[in-house]
């Protein structure tokens, strides 16, 4: 039977041991690493004292607390019994028999009065009778308890009495002051000061009249605290605390062997590719400020740090705004988080001269209340437990802060919005693709930080309310959103993941970073307008190519005017190709490719306008000043046609660097840059105005010339010629582009369609007016057709009537070809 039962019992024992080991392993994973000495963990955030020790609170939630030994001998109602005394030890106690007594069992000690069997070990010939058995303790103090018990035997009446010393310290017959320690001696007693105490001035140390007072080891220099700690006196002793904001490195907390280190401040280094003198001065100023930091002037340091940031943001940032913002916000939050540890508990607010607002709240980590942090621009409500997280500070406090700067928009105002999480639902709602979105900041950018640095997923939501520009009505394709700035690979973008906004303007988020209220304008793609644009541009490119070939190959029409027409068509042709191929910014990020496309479009379209202006100048010299010279030379025309737009692009780059080129939606000019709109609209408006004036003068002069050439011309034919000429000049001189200056409302569908049709078909209009309506061009086309088909070429006799011939000859001098 033993052979059968033993294996089963062995298996059960093994399983039980493994189960216990697994439980201990699971518990160890959830244990707090910071539990103080003489305590054990009960969770990953709390500890309890071991038996025999106690703390101020039942649960220990930060390492600043400690477990002190319980002196069981002083507990009310405690007694070891007759002929015994209590001896306290660290975490426990024992009861031992008085001198001359021993336990019947022969043991050295016991713990309960019920176990007391103390009996006299010396045979005196009499039966000892207990008399005046007293157990007393020392006066209040931090020294271990000392207890002395005296037993006086009383002989029978017939026996001689043997006198024994009376322990006045135990019997209560002493008159020592409560601040002293009673020491019994043969025939008397002394009253002396304990360790950490001293006689008051004028008092002796020993007599009954001795009165003691606590020794302030901290002020007297008798302490052994490390110079990295601060000595704090206690009754009869002292403790060594870390300086505010400093962290312990080794040793027991608040003990003489505690050593602390200064909190590390972030290194405000420049970006490797940044060469801004403003950034360099800012970095040096902040490094010097933090290097010379004095905890006594923490308020001054915080104010100077905020003012330095304001000074940096007031100057326009040339390049790498998102990279600078990522580094600036990270270092600023870390610095403020560290500086806040030196502040006293409670609220702290500061408003700089540039209206940058900082609000800090410093409270105990074990506070469970819902706390509000606010200033003039922002209001935040959060469960205070999330401020510390798993990070425990030595001083037992944590911080929550909000920083709002109106100038932060200069760095993050052009940051794109990430639509990946919501694109499908938005496209389903609008029924069309949404290639991009435009943003407008309605509130200040608010940077929120806590002592807890792991804020990607909080245990409870944080509620915000921002003071932002009120919106009476939200236009179509617009949405009011609560977004946060997310750093990514040195740059960043706006996102809404984890945040929601209700109708009352409150924003709820389960993570923390920098927040703002944005107005998002979704660019919903119009399939019909996109089709018109692509088909129109393809047709325009074909016609512009035919114009270029015609002006190069048809010899009879080559002149100064056809040279202007040639360069005009070349600029429009190149601009249309670049626009068709690269204008859409599918990725949403403004990179080098998008900026180069925007720059080339800027140059090509400005060059087209300049050649349109030269067309007007040619008409002016041709019609108005026909007898006063031949006009501009070829090199002068090229200098104006290509030099002026190149100069405008160069000036634009010098003013805004590359930031003005490229947009999250299209690779075109970013008109949100202050004044950058006029780098294109200014020259366009000026050229259109000048060409319109030239157009009026030209028509007026042509009317007079037609009357002088043929006074008897019929009014109908005269009106027809003037109408054709007017239409040609209107199209060539770019009035279709001028129509776009009046397209103030981008959501006006019919205006968008008209503008798109006029500009996409401009190549077709130019080909019809400059080539097909020109008789010499038609004759050349007919010759080429006959050469291809092998037919014999004949003159167009049907169109050479008398009036038509005279009209053709009259216009030939002007090379109009019509």
From Swiss-Prot:
Domain of life of the native organism: Eukaryota
Induction (record text): Up-regulated during lymphocyte activation.
Keyword Repeat: yes
SMART domains the record matches: EGF (SM00181), EGF_CA (SM00179), GPS (SM00303)
Site (Cleavage): 512-513
Positions where Phosphoserine occurs in the chain: 425, 798, 814, 816
Residues annotated as transmembrane: 534-554, 563-583, 603-623, 638-658, 680-700, 724-744, 753-773
GO biological-process terms attached to the record: cell adhesion; cell surface receptor signaling pathway; positive regulation of synapse assembly
Subcellular location(s) per record: Cell membrane
Membrane topology term: Multi-pass membrane protein
Stored Pfam families: 7tm_2, EGF_CA, GPS
Cytoplasmic side: 555-562, 624-637, 701-723, 774-818
Topological domains, Extracellular: 24-533, 584-602, 659-679, 745-752
GAIN-B domain span: 347-525
Positions of glycan attachment: 44, 112, 227, 299, 395, 461, 502
Positions with biased composition (Polar residues): 809-818
Xref: InterPro entries: EGF-like_Ca-bd_dom, EGF-like_dom, EGF-type_Asp/Asn_hydroxyl_site, EGF_Ca-bd_CS, GAIN_B, GAIN_dom_sf, GPCR_2-like_7TM, GPCR_2_ADGRE2_ADGRE5
Domain EGF-like: 27-68, 69-119, 165-213, 214-261
Statement: the UniProt record of this protein carries the keyword Acyltransferase: no
Cysteines engaged in disulfide bonds, as pairs: 31-41, 35-47, 49-67, 73-86, 80-95, 97-118, 169-182, 176-191, 193-212, 218-231, 225-240, 242-260, 482-507, 499-509
UniProt entry keywords in alphabetical sequence: Calcium, Cell adhesion, Cell membrane, Disulfide bond, EGF-like domain, G-protein coupled receptor, Glycoprotein, Membrane, Phosphoprotein, Receptor, Repeat, Secreted, Signal, Transducer, Transmembrane, Transmembrane helix
Protein family membership: Belongs to the G-protein coupled receptor 2 family. LN-TM7 subfamily.
Assembly notes: Forms a heterodimer, consisting of a large extracellular region (alpha subunit) non-covalently linked to a seven-transmembrane moiety (beta subunit). Interacts with complement decay-accelerating factor (DAF). The largest isoform (isoform 1) do not interact with DAF. Also interacts with chondroitin sulfate.
Physiological role: Receptor potentially involved in both adhesion and signaling processes early after leukocyte activation. Plays an essential role in leukocyte migration.
Name the UniProt record assigns to this protein: Adhesion G protein-coupled receptor E5
Organism: Mus musculus
């Amino acid at each position: 039977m033993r052979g059968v039962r033993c294996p089963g019992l062995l298996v059960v024992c093994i399983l039980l041991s493994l189960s216990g080991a697994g439980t201990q392993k699971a518990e160890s994973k959830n244990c707090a690493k910071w539990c103080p000495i003489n305590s054990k963990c009960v969770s990953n955030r709390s500890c309890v004292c071991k038996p025999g020790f106690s703390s101020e609170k039942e649960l220990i939630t930060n390492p600043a607390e400690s477990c002190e030994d319980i002196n069981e001998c002083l507990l009310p109602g405690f007694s070891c019994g007759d002929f015994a005394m209590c001896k306290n030890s660290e975490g426990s106690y024992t009861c031992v028999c008085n001198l001359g007594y021993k336990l019947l069992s022969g043991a050295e000690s016991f713990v309960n009065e019920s176990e007391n069997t103390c009996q006299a070990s010396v045979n005196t010939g009499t039966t000892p009778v207990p008399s005046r058995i007293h157990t007393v303790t020392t006066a209040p103090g931090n020294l271990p308890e000392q207890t002395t018990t005296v037993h006086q035997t009383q002989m029978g009446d017939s026996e001689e009495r043997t006198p024994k010393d009376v322990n006045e310290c135990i019997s209560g017959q002493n008159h020592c002051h409560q601040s002293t320690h009673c020491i019994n001696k043969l025939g008397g007693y002394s009253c002396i000061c304990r360790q950490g105490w001293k006689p008051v001035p004028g008092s002796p140390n020993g007599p009954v009249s001795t009165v003691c007072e606590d020794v302030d080891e901290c002020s007297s220099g008798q302490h052994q605290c490390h110079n990295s700690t601060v000595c704090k006196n206690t009754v009869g002793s002292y403790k060594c605390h870390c300086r505010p904001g400093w962290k312990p490195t080794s040793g027991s907390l608040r003990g003489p062997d505690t050593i602390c280190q200064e909190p590390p401040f972030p290194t405000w280094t420049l970006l490797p590719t940044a060469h801004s003198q403003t950034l360099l001065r800012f970095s040096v100023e902040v490094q010097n400020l933090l290097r010379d930091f004095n905890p006594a002037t923490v308020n001054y340091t915080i104010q100077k740090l905020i003012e330095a940031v304001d000074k940096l943001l007031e100057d326009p940032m040339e390049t790498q705004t998102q990279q600078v913002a990522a580094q600036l916000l990270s270092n600023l939050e870390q610095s403020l988080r560290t500086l806040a540890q030196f502040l006293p508990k409670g609220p702290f607010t500061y408003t700089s001269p540039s209206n940058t607002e900082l609000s800090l709240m410093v409270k105990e980590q074990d506070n469970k209340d819902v706390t509000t942090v606010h200033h003039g621009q922002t209001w935040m409500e959060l469960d205070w437990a999330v401020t510390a997280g798993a990070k425990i500070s030595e001083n037992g406090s944590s911080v929550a802060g909000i920083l709002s700067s109106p100038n932060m928009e200069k760095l993050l105002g052009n940051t794109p919005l990430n639509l990946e999480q919501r694109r499908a639902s938005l496209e389903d709602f609008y029924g069309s693709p949404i290639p991009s979105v435009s943003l407008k900041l309605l509130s200040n950018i608010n940077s929120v930080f806590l002592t807890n640095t792991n804020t990607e997923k909080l245990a409870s939501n944080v509620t915000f309310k921002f003071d932002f520009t009120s919106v009476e009505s939200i236009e179509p394709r617009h949405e009011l959103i609560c977004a946060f700035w997310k750093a990514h690979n040195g740059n960043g973008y706006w996102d809404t993941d984890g945040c929601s906004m209700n109708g009352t303007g409150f924003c709820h988020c389960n993570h923390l970073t920098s927040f703002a209220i944005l107005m998002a304008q979704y660019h919903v793609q119009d399939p019909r307008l996109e089709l018109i644009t692509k088909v129109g541009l393809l047709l325009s490119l074909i016609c512009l190519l035919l114009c270029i070939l015609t002006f190069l190959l048809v010899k009879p029409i080559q002149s100064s005017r056809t040279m202007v027409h040639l360069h005009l068509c070349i600029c429009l042709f190149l601009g249309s190709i670049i626009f068709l191929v690269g204008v859409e910014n599918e990725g949403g990020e403004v990179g080098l490719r998008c900026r180069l496309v925007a720059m080339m479009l800027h140059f090509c379209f400005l060059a087209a306008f300049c050649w349109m202006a030269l067309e007007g100048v040619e008409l002016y010299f041709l019609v108005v000043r026909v007898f006063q010279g031949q006009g501009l030379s070829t090199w002068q025309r090229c200098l104006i046609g290509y030099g002026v737009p190149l100069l405008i692009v160069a000036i634009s780059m010098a003013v805004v660097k590359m930031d003005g080129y490229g947009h999250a939606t299209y690779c075109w000019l970013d008109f949100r840059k202050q004044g950058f709109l006029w780098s294109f609209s200014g020259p366009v408006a000026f050229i259109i105005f000048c060409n319109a004036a030239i157009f009026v003068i030209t028509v007026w002069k042509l009317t007079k010339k037609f009357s002088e050439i043929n006074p008897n011309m019929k009014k109908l034919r005269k009106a027809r010629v003037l109408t054709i000429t007017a239409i040609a000049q209107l199209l060539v001189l770019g009035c279709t582009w001028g129509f776009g200056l009046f397209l103030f409302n981008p959501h006006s569908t019919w205006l968008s369609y008209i503008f798109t049709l006029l500009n996409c078909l401009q190549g077709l209009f130019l080909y019809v007016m400059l080539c097909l309506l020109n008789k010499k061009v038609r004759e050349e086309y007919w010759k080429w057709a006959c050469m291809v088909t092998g037919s014999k070429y004949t003159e167009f006799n049907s169109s050479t009537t008398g009036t038509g011939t005279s009209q053709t000859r009259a216009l030939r001098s002007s090379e109009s070809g019509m």
